[in-house]
Structure formats: structure tokens, C-alpha cells
Amino acid sequence: MALPPEVCIRGAGIVGRTLALLLARERVRVALVAEAPSTPSPDRPDVRAYALNAASRSLLESLRAWPDAAQATPVREMQVFGDEDGRVRFDAAEQKVDALAWIVDVPALEEQLAAAVRFSPQVEVVTAPVKAALTVVCEGKASLTREALGVQYDVTRYPQIAIAARLEAERPHGGVARQWFSAQGDVLALLPMGGAEGRQLALVWSVGQLRAPELLALEADAFCARLREASHEALGGFTLSSERAAWPLQRATADRWAGRFAEGGAWVLAGDAAHTVHPLAGQGLNLGLADAAELARVIRERDYWRSVGDARLLRRYERARRADVLAMGLATDGLQQLFAQGIEPLARLRNWGMLGFDRSHLLKSWVARRAMGLASGISSPSPSGRGLG
């Protein structure tokens, strides 16, 4: 890159690389700060998987960064079960779409994005921050840059631990994502992987802080037996195909998303550096990619005489994204709180509510289309292939 960068992106994760590619497509010069890649241990493979909606898929496909079919399994149906007889079913055919979402293998997606960045002449990968008109902080929820800027990260800690692993099921998953809410507030999600007729699953089991150590200490067979019971034999038995990972759950939002450095230049937050939500709705990465898309859009549509770090642009980005993140955060928080209450009348009410919601086709369709990113969030790429429409 002969000329100095206009934008410095701190953090080369999925959101950071996506933003770099979006800006590069608009001929914006980008410096992408990346740490030296770590080699995963063969004994402890990366078990992360994300549910990506149609808007996120369209965005990544426009950047030629969508993984192969084997690493992006379509979800044709989603079944959500309450702690009694409550049940909600979403079906792709009813929504007239190919899939409700895709369960994507994180290492495969990261590899696709890294390859796209390597072939982008507008993006220079650097090992330390450089001066630019705009610095975008995409360092994740533990961002050191955000902390150094004095930005308050308002955290609500849930009394839950997420346990993640890869599984092999006794029966094919059929492209169905299944989720159970228990009377104790636990949320069990079994996400299909390995193709539409595969048996591989991504497990995300959000359990109470006191129960998590017990489950993690179990031998593999005993853990799978508990899992089989919690999933009501929906897929028969399970075999662990990876180590188990665990982390505490939280919802958080930064009190400021944009500002200026004392020495000059603007900064803005994106992705988990700006916000996190409970994983029960599977929307965390979709929100981060929508951040990247919106920031790229306001930069693309700016008046020719405005800098990429213009305060008006960054306020426009923050207003748009805060509203979307707040709505999703409140929705996931409300669901978590609703099922965390063990009061019997409330249990009957929430299960009755699930049944009523399942019968309300208009409301269910509206919720489904929002979750797919078809009602708000990420815009589709423009017909010219430049930017977002």
C-alpha cells in the first residue's frame, strides 16, 4: 500500500476481516491489525460454530468468503420446546426460503475470509496499530483498546455457563435445529452440521453456574447420557467428537461507540467490542456482521468532501446499530428471564404463550423474517457489486 491507510481496523476476526473487505471494495485503503495466527492443538480442536442468517450469507457470498457446503449446513426447520407442552416450529418452506439459517464451522469461515484478505490489494495486514483518519475497534468483548479509551462496558452477567462441543448423533438430524428450555432456566441447543442428512451436531448448552462444573467433570459417556435425557431422545444417543469448552454468559453494551483520540483521528466500535447478547437466539455474529455492513454503507454514501472519520457519519452508524442491538438484547434477555423463573403459574403461562405464538402465522412469520435478516439489519449487495444497497 503506497499511500497511508484511511482506516485502521484493530482485530482480524470475522467482523474485522469482513469490514476490511467491504471497505476495500469501495477503494478505501485499510490497515488490518492481526496477531500472529495460533495453530490449534489437534487434541483440542476449535468447536465454535455460528448460526448465520440469509443476510449474513448474502454479504459473505458477495465477498467470495462463504464456506463450502460441507462447512455451512442449511437449517430447514427449527423446533423450540418449553419446559412443559409449549412448542414453536419454524419451517423454511412455510417462509418460502431455502433455509432459515446456516450453521457454519468457524475455522472454515475464518480461512475463507483470510484468503480473501490476502488477495485484496487495498488491505495491508500489519502487526501493530497505525495512524489513520478512522480506527475501528473489533477486538472482541475483552477489547484492550476500548478499555484504554475509558469506554464503559455495561455488563449484565447471567448466572449461566455455556458448554460447547461437537457431537455425533445416533440418528440423522435432517437439517433441523432443536432447542429446549428447561424449568431450571437451562437452554439446550443442538445445531445440525455436516450436511443436510448428516449426524454431526454443534452443542451449545447454557446451564446454571453450579451445575456446569458437574457436567464438565463427567466422563464422556455419562455426559452424553445426560444430554440424551435433556433432549428427550430426539436423536437417540450421542458420542462426543471433541473436547468440551465452557465460558460464562453475559449481555453487554458499550456506553459510547464512537469518539476521537486525544492525538487526533476518530475511533468507532464494532462487533463484540460494542455489544454481546445471550446466545439462545444465535444472533451474535449476525449483529456483528450487520455492524460491518452499516459502517461500510455510511462510509460509501458519505459526501465526497467528508473524511471517513467524520463525526456525523459515525453518529449515523451508532444510532442505526444501537437500535437493532437493543431490540435483540431485550428479546433474548426477556426469554432467558422468563424461563429462569420456576413459579408454577408462570410456567403454565409461558408454555401457553408458546402454543399461541406457534398458531399465530403472521407474528411467527414476522419474527422469522427478522431473525433471517430480511426485515432489518444487513442490506443486500447492490446490483453493481459495489457496496451495500
Task: Annotate each predicted stretch with a short phrase.
Residues R297-G389:
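C-terminal helical "tail/cap" subdomain of flavin- and related membrane-associated enzymes
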Residues R10, A24-V47:
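Glycine-rich FAD pyrophosphate-binding loop
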Residues A2-L3, S58-S62, Q71-A148, D154-A164:
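Conserved N-terminal helical subregion
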Residues D46-A70:
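N-terminal glycine-rich dinucleotide-binding loop that anchors FAD/FMN and/or NAD(P) in oxidoreductases
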Residues A2-G13:
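Beta1/beta-strand and adjacent pyrophosphate-binding region of the FAD-binding site
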